[in-house]
Regions:
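Conserved hydrophobic positions within beta-strands
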Residues: 14, 61, 70, 75-78
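A short beta-strand motif that forms part of the nucleic acid-binding face
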Residues: 31, 65, 74
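Short, charged/polar surface micro-motifs in flexible loops or helix N-caps
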Residues: 34-35, 77-78, 84-85
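Short, conserved catalytic or interaction motifs in soluble domains
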Residues: 63-66, 83
C-alpha cells in the first residue's frame, strides 16, 4: 500500500508539495510514483534561479522501466535542488518524502495552492 502523508499536498502528476510559512515549498515525487517507475537511476534537475509556470516540465526521472517528465506544481522559482538525490537517485525509491525531496521553490502565486489535492483526494485517483 502506498504512503500518502496527510500533511502534504499533491498533484495529479504524482508529486507532493510541503508548504512552508515563509512562502517557500519543498517538492518531490510520491510513493506511488516511485513504485510505478521501479528502480530510479537518474534525475535531471533544473538550475537554481530558474522560474517555471504551473505544468511546465522542470526535469526528468529515469528508471530501469521508463523515463518520466517532472512537472512544476505551482508558478515558482527554484531555490535549491537536492544534491543528495543527484548523487544517489535511489533515495527517491527508499525515502521519497524525506531524504528524497527534489526541489525547494519560492511560490510566485500563492493562490494556486488551492488547486492542489489533499491526501484523501489524491488517494482517490491512485
Amino acid at each position: 500500500m502506498n504512503q500518502i502523508p496527510e500533511a502534504l499536498l499533491y498533484t495529479k502528476d504524482h508529486e507532493w508539495i510541503q508548504l512552508h510559512q515563509d512562502g517557500t515549498a519543498t517538492v518531490g515525487i510520491t510513493d506511488y510514483a516511485q513504485e510505478s517507475l521501479g528502480d530510479i537511476t537518474f534525475v535531471e534537475f533544473p538550475l537554481a534561479g530558474e522560474s517555471f509556470n504551473t505544468g511546465d516540465t522542470f526535469g526528468v526521472v529515469e528508471s530501469v522501466k521508463a523515463a518520466s517528465d517532472l512537472y512544476m506544481p505551482l508558478d515558482a522559482e527554484v531555490l535549491e535542488v537536492n544534491d543528495e538525490v543527484d548523487a544517489e537517485p535511489e533515495l527517491l525509491n527508499s525515502d521519497p518524502y524525506q531524504k528524497g525531496w527534489l526541489l525547494k521553490i519560492r511560490l510566485t502565486d500563492a493562490s494556486q495552492v488551492e488547486a492542489l489535492l489533499k491526501a484523501d483526494a489524491y488517494a482517490g485517483i491512485i
